[in-house]
Amino acid sequence: MAGSSQRTASKLEFLEGSRSGIRYDPDQLRGTDPADGRTLLARYDLASARDSLTLEAIAARRAGLWRWEELLPVRRRSSITTLGEGATPLLPPARLASKLGLRGLFIKAESVNPTGSFKARGMAVAVSRAVELGADHLVAPSAGNAGGALAAYAAAAGVRATVVMPADAPIANQQEAALCGARVILLDGLISDCGKLARLIAELSGAFDMATLREPYRVEGKKTLGFELAEDFDWALPDAVVYPTGGGTGLVGMWKAFDELQALGLIGAARPRMYAVQADGCAPIVRAFEEGSEFAEPWPHAVTRAAGIRVPSALGDHLILDCLRRSGGGAIAVPEVEIDAMQTFAAREGAGYLSLESSAALAALPFMLERGLIGADERVALFDTGAGFKSEAPSMERPAVVSNDPGAWPDVIASLNDAKVPDPRRPI
């Protein structure tokens, strides 16, 4: 974004410990709460923001994440680093919804963000704010998409980036981060192990740790999902939100957004039921929810091909669980085989090439419908958090190579009539 030294309309007032409640100066570069090591959350002068954030004013602004500048932390326009993130479409997947028995299903297509996933939102705001406060080297652990987004926005801001990924992170994500100029370190371990190395890098090199909920501002970018959802539904929130959950920043951010929108008078008190979906091979939030725990114990031997939700331990676990419970929602684990099946099924029913994480969320819907967690006529918003081509490639037969001899082509054409139609049955 072409900028100047002109100030934004940000109404940022202070940072607050998510558990301690202690307030901190927001104009110093901070990570977690010094009191307890938990997440810091940005707080705004909402009474002042109410004067300028009216429905009419919002509608008149340029589409995109930064139209919500009163409720974002960046102080100067020259500090904003943007690649055009936000303003993603809310799509009604008619054929898929019909097959799943849901007449009010909508998919928020975050895969159209500039780095191919919802991670662009968080990194756009967090990188902008970190650089504004003096950071010149950023480091983060990543299962894939966050690393690519950090690398892209760091490059746009002109600062260094280091990304620590599990060695089995999807190749597309490794290539994206490296191509954008980040130093990519592949670690023989899980995302939690990558987080430990990233923290050590920050400690020894002076880099700023951008890990999920270990700094205050990625959640501020992610909360724009909630702002847009309210606007997409004409300021009457859907009945339920279904979200593939690893670190949980999106859920935490949306819940924060709904609180802020209500304080501004833009929505009422009604909230969607929030549902976290995880793979059954890595479901710490599901287990903690079912056990009634405030925190989630680390999940041992985490296994799932959906790299973005292979998070054995989330720093924001208490925030995620609080959101689920306060909303009357829940947490669902789906079998790995159903994730793979749903990715293919959804694509063949016209929903596009969705990520494995998004496919996990879709795979939960038949179970939720059967158990009465959602109704066939309810408005359900599901988040497509990333593009399918950035996930681990599915196991599929390579199409046969056809001879370039025109004499063989009639047989090829005739074989098209023998092609099997995909089985339209639900995968669960």
Regions found by a protein language model. Give the residues of each.
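PLP-dependent amino-acid enzyme catalytic core
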Residues: M1-I428
